[in-house]
């Protein structure tokens, strides 16, 4: 009789333990397994380029070296003078609303980009070598980490360059460096070039206290 009572008590304890144990979290960081373009016909023709401006250097997103999927990457000490050609891809709805590597929130409708080694936040002019179109983007994320791709543009930026349907394009990426006094260089040379039209908004110095402040979180670890 005592043995049956002990077995009954043990069984009850096991059931209680199972009922009180939390369910394993099988949720992913992303709700979509595959990236995709937004639904509907998004018109990017009237979308303005990112406006380069001076931003204080930040630690968030600039850890160097860092590792992704077992591979080590290094962040540049400075973006000044950077220019390189390679393959551009784009990212969209899967990542929309999620945090970037420096703690900002990715918006696929803004002119932004991800790069493996440029310091963030930063700016770059990206030119589609197949059709000559160019855009200016704000680099605030890390990637792409697939194959030999050079840069990931937001869906909006890719559409302005005309390759959103193909998925990738041959591009040239030239870093835009903005100095504290508002002067700029493109791939290490004065920008805009002498004689070129000047966009007053791009040259405007936001002044002390006007620099963007964000909650920043490191995204990668060794």
Predicted regions: what is each one?
Residues 19-22:
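Bacterial signal peptide processing site
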Residues 1-6:
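Bacterial N-terminal signal peptides that target proteins for export
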Residues 87, 94-200:
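Exported/periplasmic cell-wall-interacting domains
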Residues 27-36:
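Mature, extracytoplasmic segments of signal peptide-bearing proteins
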Residues 207-222:
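Solvent-exposed beta-strand motifs enriched in subsets of small alpha/beta binding domains
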Residues 14-17:
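C-terminal motif of bacterial Sec signal peptides marking the signal peptidase cleavage site
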Residues 46-64:
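Short acidic, Pro/Gly- and aromatic-enriched capping/linker segments at domain boundaries
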């Amino acid at each position: 009789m005592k043995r049956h009572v002990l077995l009954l008590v043990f069984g009850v304890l096991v059931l209680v333990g199972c009922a009180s144990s939390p369910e394993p979290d099988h949720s992913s960081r992303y709700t979509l397994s595959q990236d995709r373009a937004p639904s509907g016909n998004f018109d990017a023709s009237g979308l303005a380029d990112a406006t380069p401006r001076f931003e204080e250097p930040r630690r968030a997103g600039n850890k160097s070296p860092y590792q992704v999927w077992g591979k080590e990457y290094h962040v540049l000490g400075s973006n000044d003078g950077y220019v390189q050609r390679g393959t551009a891809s784009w990212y969209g709805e899967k990542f929309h609303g999620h945090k970037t590597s420096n703690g900002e929130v990715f918006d696929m409708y803004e002119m932004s980009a991800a790069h493996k080694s440029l310091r963030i936040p930063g700016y770059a002019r990206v030119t589609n070598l197949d059709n000559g179109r160019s855009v200016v983007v704000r680099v605030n994320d890390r990637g792409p980490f697939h194959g030999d791709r050079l840069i990931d543009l937001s869906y909006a930026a890719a559409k302005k360059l005309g390759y959103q349907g193909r998925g990738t394009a041959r591009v040239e990426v030239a870093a835009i460096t903005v100095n504290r006094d508002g002067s700029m260089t493109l791939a290490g040379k004065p920008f805009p070039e002498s004689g070129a039209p000047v966009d007053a908004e791009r040259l405007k110095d936001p002044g002390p206290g006007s620099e963007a402040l964000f909650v920043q979180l490191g995204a990668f670890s060794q």
